Amino acid sequence: MQSTSVCIIGAGPGGTMAALRLAKDNIPFVIVDKDEFPREKICGDALSGKVPHIIRRLSPEILERFEEKCKPMHSFGIRFIAPGNYVFDVPFIENYNAEKHPVPGYTVKRKLLDAFMVEEVSNIAGEKLMTACTVMSIEKGEDGFIIDTSSGQIQAKMIIDASGAASSFKAPYPKPEPEPKKTALAVRTYYKGVKGLHPENFIELYFLENILPGYFWIFPLPDGLANIGIGIRKDVVLKKKINLSAVMDEIIRNNPLVSPRFRDAERLGKPAACRLPLGNPRFRIAGERYMLAGDAAHLVDPLTGEGVGNALYSGFIAAEQAIDCFNENRFDDAFMLAYGQRIRRVLGKEMSISTNFQKMLKYPRMVKWIAKRADGNKHIPGLMSSMFTDLDHRKKLLNPIFILRVLMNR
């Protein structure tokens, strides 16, 4: 049996970020993952500005190596397509200037991102990184946990569980399954040769009437590729008996804004499916000697489906909470509340806004009315851009009266 201060379960973005942050303060850890890397990971492959921001905060040198090795495509905004074919281009940073602004976002295959992060951990952790290692069960002891794995037992004073929402091992702490209304089902595939991609690599979100409250997406990737997919809330899929692959193909073949762009495109491989635990968890994500991070904490953005940035942030925050625990020699339930409070402070407002907008998407007539009012409204693009950079504007967007006044040009 090997002993360590922190056992990190899961070597995705949340787990590897936690490991790298712990290493900066020389906190011993072991990180385990059931997979070998590089691995395929079903994802939209779009990384918001949170990703370069938090990696740069950890280490500017790591961000430089990421750009050099993975060669991600820089993405500068989002193109929203609303019912009625209203199109809104929203830059991540208004009046972007490369000389003074940081990179606003990326698109890159998750396979490359995850492999890069694991390599960074491997360089500092050596044999403490255990891949192809399955967690069988976890038992709570007086001074921590015993983690039983396919490669032997690990004794740890703390656990950071970044194993996702569908892990099968038995744990001595609550880890609720996502409810249907708090889960999105998604299908994605890759195409080569899609025409009409935005010159500044805006990702495209199509909020089409027949798939609300979900959306169809087109995300440009390096080497002339595009990630194409569709995501809809699970309860809606079950109620309407929606075949996501069939609906995606129907949009590609027949939607007037989409189909001409795919006329000469080639699909690469079969569609793949995944589920996303949508954010704003109402359960405890930390307790005595444990924390949940990333998808295990249900931190996927309810509107956009983005999870990588939130996973990286939660891994970083979990590691800093663990550092505080060892500095203060406190691992009790009350002390661990600080982790959940910090997650809510950093990510909570944004997820509340996304939740409210996602709920609104259930009403196509309302969405159409808003899109019609917003069309040509000079305040809308700037207001939406400010959501990505200005916390005060995010708070205002929680107020429906403020939104109504903007739509009415008041």
Label for each model-derived stretch:
Residues 7, 23-43:
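Glycine-rich FAD pyrophosphate-binding loop
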Residues 137, 153, 236-321, 327:
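FAD/FMN-dependent oxidoreductases across multiple families
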Residues 120-261:
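Predominantly flavin-linked oxidoreductase catalytic cores and closely associated redox partners
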Residues 12-13, 37-38, 112:
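Residue-level detector of alpha-helix initiation sites
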Residues 96-119, 238-243:
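Short beta-strand to alpha-helix junction loop
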Residues 41-84:
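N-terminal FAD cofactor-binding segment of flavoenzymes
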Residues 1-14:
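Beta1/beta-strand and adjacent pyrophosphate-binding region of the FAD-binding site
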Residues 323-410:
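C-terminal helical "tail/cap" subdomain of flavin- and related membrane-associated enzymes
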